[in-house]
From Swiss-Prot:
Catalysed reaction, written as an equation: O-phospho-L-tyrosyl-[protein] + H2O = L-tyrosyl-[protein] + phosphate
GO-annotated biological processes: cellular response to leukemia inhibitory factor; endothelial cell migration; Notch signaling pathway; positive regulation of establishment of protein localization; positive regulation of non-canonical NF-kappaB signal transduction; positive regulation of vascular permeability; regulation of DNA-templated transcription; regulation of vascular endothelial growth factor signaling pathway
Propeptide residues per the UniProt entry: 171-173
Name this polypeptide is given: Protein tyrosine phosphatase type IVA 3
PTM remark: Farnesylated. Farnesylation is required for membrane targeting. Unfarnesylated forms are shifted into the nucleus.
One Gene Ontology CC term in the entry: early endosome
Pfam families: Tc-R-P (PF22785)
Gene: Ptp4a3
Domain Tyrosine-protein phosphatase intervals: 8-161
Subunit structure: Interacts with tubulin.
Enzyme Commission number, as recorded: 3.1.3.48
Mutagenesis / variant outcome for changing residue 104 to S: Loss of enzymatic activity; reduced migration-promoting activity
Length: 173
């Protein structure tokens, strides 16, 4: 069987947020996937596609795998968006500069959309978020997902009240 030519993992950094967008590994390519995660310091993987590998080896290496699958080519359901933003708020507030890996099948649709949502929620315009991601991941985000991002209204969920000054701050400053 011919191997699919998959794009290399891509790091997207904005303020103190770091994401690793990648394609899904298989059990046969899992060791390379784990090496990539370690190289970028990713300790959390968000899997938004069907299961294609055993997550036990990752967990043995201290990497948490979260499963939030949704349909290929589609925008994420509200529950996935809420869970994603809650994860990021906690992760980047407690460990600024840490890296969260996210993957779908090819790393061109579902995963980049979630990263775009994070960028938008932290204050970036949707057009800028898409361009920022596409500069690093050519072909990312299809037209249906693009329309979703255009209509998406951020609620600034990656922001928090500073307990000392009582001012609203971005959790990723």
């Amino acid at each position: 069987m011919a191997r699919m030519n998959r794009p290399a993992p891509v790091e997207v950094s904005y303020r103190h947020m770091r994401f690793l967008i990648t394609h899904n590994p298989s059990n046969a390519t899992l060791s390379t996937f784990i090496e990539d995660l370690k190289k970028y310091g990713a300790t959390t993987v968000v899997r938004v596609c069907e299961v294609t590998y055993d997550k036990t080896p990752l967990e043995k290496d201290g990497i948490t795998v979260v499963d939030w699958p949704f349909d290929d080519g589609a925008p994420p359901p509200g529950k996935v968006v809420e869970d994603w933003l809650s994860l990021l708020k906690a992760k980047f507030y407690n460990d600024p500069g840490s890296c969260v890996a996210v993957h779908c099948v090819a790393g061109l649709g579902r995963a980049p959309v979630l990263v775009a949502l994070a960028l938008i929620e932290s204050g970036m315009k949707y057009e800028d978020a898409i361009q920022f991601i596409r500069q690093k991941r050519r072909g990312a985000i299809n037209s249906k997902q693009l329309t979703y991002l255009e209509k998406y209204r951020p609620k600034q969920r990656l922001r928090f009240k500073d307990p000392h000054t009582h001012k609203t701050r971005c959790c990723v400053m």
